[in-house]
């Protein structure tokens, strides 16, 4: 269970469901293909531990869905898995053997690409079999430090960049600002670490005013 299909309404819920909460810096990352899927392993240096049995300065691996591999690697991954996919022959016809080594297949799930040196707060789940971690609900479990002491959810940034057809990454030094004239549903939430830590200790009841929400018992 990678917690991809879960949604959390508060920092308190994220804290309760996380195995590990750390402030960490991306040291390196590697993309790889498996069948039709592409994933990215991020080597993360732990700068601060907010929850979990781990030491500051350790390195952990955080795996995320999506990434980019060469056309050659992607085709080989399908062949090794015994998968015959509709676009495999199209890829072979479109690219020569040399071009397959120079061109890439990218898969994105409205998520940001990692950037070496970037610092984020991560809410993580431990894999049951491997010594790796997954973010709680993908990008919703990551808050990027967009300026000193300020954090923005990675999914919110990715959604805005997708809507603007911008590259799916936040470059080092690139800041995020809130538009004071934006509608509430379009505004970006910017948190300080003190606000996050305080909300992690404060239970907030889930919203009940959306379609399909269970009615309060009488």
Q: Language-model features: where?
A:
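Short glycine/threonine/proline-enriched tight-turn/helix- or strand-capping micro-motif at secondary-structure
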Residues: 1-11
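Netrin-like (NTR/C345C) domain of secreted extracellular proteins
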Residues: 1, 71-218
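Extracellular/periplasmic catalytic domains that process cell-envelope and extracellular macromolecules
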Residues: 15-16, 36, 54-55, 113-116
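Short edge-strand/loop segments of extracellular domains
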Residues: 45-52
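Short coil-to-beta-strand transition motifs
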Residues: 12-23
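Conserved positions in beta-strands of structured domains
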Residues: 27-30
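Short aromatic-glycine-enriched beta-strand elements
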Residues: 32-45
């Amino acid at each position: 269970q990678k917690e991809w299909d879960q949604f959390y309404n508060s920092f308190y819920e994220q804290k309760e469901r996380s195995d590990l909460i750390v402030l960490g810096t991306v040291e390196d990352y590697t993309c790889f293909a498996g069948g039709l899927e592409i994933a990215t392993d991020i080597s993360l240096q732990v700068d601060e531990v907010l929850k979990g049995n781990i030491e500051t300065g350790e390195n952990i691996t955080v795996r995320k869905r999506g990434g980019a591999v060469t056309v050659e690697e992607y085709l080989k991954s399908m062949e090794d898995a015994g998968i015959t996919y509709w676009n495999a022959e199209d890829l072979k016809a479109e690219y020569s053997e040399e071009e397959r080594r120079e061109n890439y297949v990218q898969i994105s799930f409205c998520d940001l690409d990692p950037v070496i040196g970037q610092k984020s707060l991560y809410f993580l789940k431990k894999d049951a079999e491997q010594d790796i971690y997954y973010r709680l609900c993908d990008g919703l479990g990551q808050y990027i430090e967009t300026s000193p002491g300020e954090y923005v959810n990675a999914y919110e940034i990715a959604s805005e960049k997708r809507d603007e057809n911008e590259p799916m990454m936040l470059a080092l030094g690139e800041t995020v600002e809130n538009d004071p004239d934006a509608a509430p549903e379009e505004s970006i939430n910017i948190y300080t670490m003190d606000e996050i830590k305080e909300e992690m200790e404060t239970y907030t009841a889930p919203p009940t005013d959306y379609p399909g929400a269970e009615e309060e018992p009488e």
